[in-house]
A protein has these predicted regions:
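Cleavable N-terminal export/targeting peptides
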Residues: 1-33, 322-336
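Subset of outer-membrane beta-barrel
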Residues: 32-336
């Protein structure tokens, strides 16, 4: 018994230390600006196939991020999601889900920003004995990007521009896999491709160099119930878009205080590393059908001296129309 306890403690320490081990390793990656440190609050950002990956009939979420607060005009991002279970059969272990994802960001003295809206349809199917679930999704949306030329300092601020607003369609697809090994361990893995059509976003002239490049995302999350009230949740995410890469890694620890409906209550805390860019701390409260979360990340990149290491803070809230059982003594399937 003593040996098992030591083994659990060592695994927990390894999970917590992973963000720092990766972050200070010798290789570096270039990251994109638009991202969230609270990955689970906006799962559709990583993969449309995660639409419907929840134990309920509907889910709604909003996340706000304020980055580089030390500058005069910080980079701000907000996203909102709505997901609905259209059909769901626990007998055949399959179903259909629909989702809506909205995102907007803005920064700089030119008031440059973008807005996106996407509709998502996903189909999921249980495999084998039901411990495996495969989800496939398609996404179609529209985006707009633009800036305010009247804020430019030039002889003729509009002379070189054909337009100051670009409106374009976007297409995406994704796949996700869920595997529950036993009552104490599960994992989910997903891969997606966004901007498959690579729309034109040029403000000057139509050019292949001014297209919104395809974005590849990979996301993995697991949970291991180390005891009746504790869960360890490692996470790994990767995004690639043209010459830019982003690698995030971290681990959360969740304390389940009450698992009986309707007074479900749990707390979570974790560390996240964005390689070569930032380190973040995440805090969350899960109460009944609500999830409240806060995150703060410190800038550890070469911009740290200019930003005074002030990175970003995030706040988010998620509401789920749930169908919880009276008591959950083990990890539930995220869908059925």
């Amino acid at each position: 018994m003593k040996g098992k306890t030591i083994h659990k403690v060592l695994r927990l320490l390894l999970c917590i230390s992973l963000p720092f081990i990766f972050h200070f390793s010798p290789f570096t990656l270039r990251a994109q600006d638009q991202h969230f440190s609270m990955l689970d609050l906006d799962p559709l950002l990583f993969n449309p196939a995660y639409s419907g990956f929840f134990d309920g009939t509907g889910r709604f979420g909003v996340v706000y991020r304020n980055q580089w607060a030390s500058v005069s005009t910080p980079f701000q991002t907000v996203s909102a999601t709505a997901e609905f279970a259209l059909t769901r059969s626990s007998r055949n272990m399959n179903g259909l889900s629909a989702g809506l994802w909205l995102s907007a960001d803005r920064a700089g003295t030119l008031d440059y920003g973008s807005t996106s809206a996407s509709a998502i349809v996903s189909y999921f199917q249980g495999l084998g004995d039901g411990n495996h679930i495969l989800s496939l999704a398609l996404e179609a949306g529209v985006g707009q990007s633009g800036f305010s030329p009247d804020r430019m300092v030039a002889d003729d601020a509009t002379e070189a521009f054909v337009r100051t607003r670009a409106l374009y369609p976007t297409l995406g697809a994704g796949a996700a896999w869920f595997w529950q090994l036993n009552e104490s361990l599960y994992t989910k893995l997903g891969i997606a491709m966004r901007n498959i059509n690579e729309p034109d976003i040029s403000f000057t002239e139509l050019s292949s160099d001014a297209r919104l490049s395809r974005r590849l995302t990979v996301y993995a999350r697991g949970e291991w119930r180390t005891a009746s009230q504790w869960g360890v949740m490692p996470v790994l995410g990767f995004q690639h878009q043209r010459n830019f890469n982003e690698l995030v890694y971290g681990c959360d620890v969740r304390w389940y205080i009450r698992e009986s409906s309707p007074d479900f209550l749990a707390f979570s805390a974790g560390l996240l590393g964005r390689h070569g860019d930032a380190a973040a701390i995440n805090l969350g409260v899960l109460w009944r059908e609500w999830t409240f979360a806060f995150s703060y990340d410190a800038n550890l990149s070469r911009l740290a001296s200019a930003s005074h290491t002030i990175g970003a803070f995030e706040v988010g809230v998620v509401y789920m129309i749930a169908k919880r059982s009276a008591k959950r003594s083990s990890l539930p399937c995220p869908i059925f």
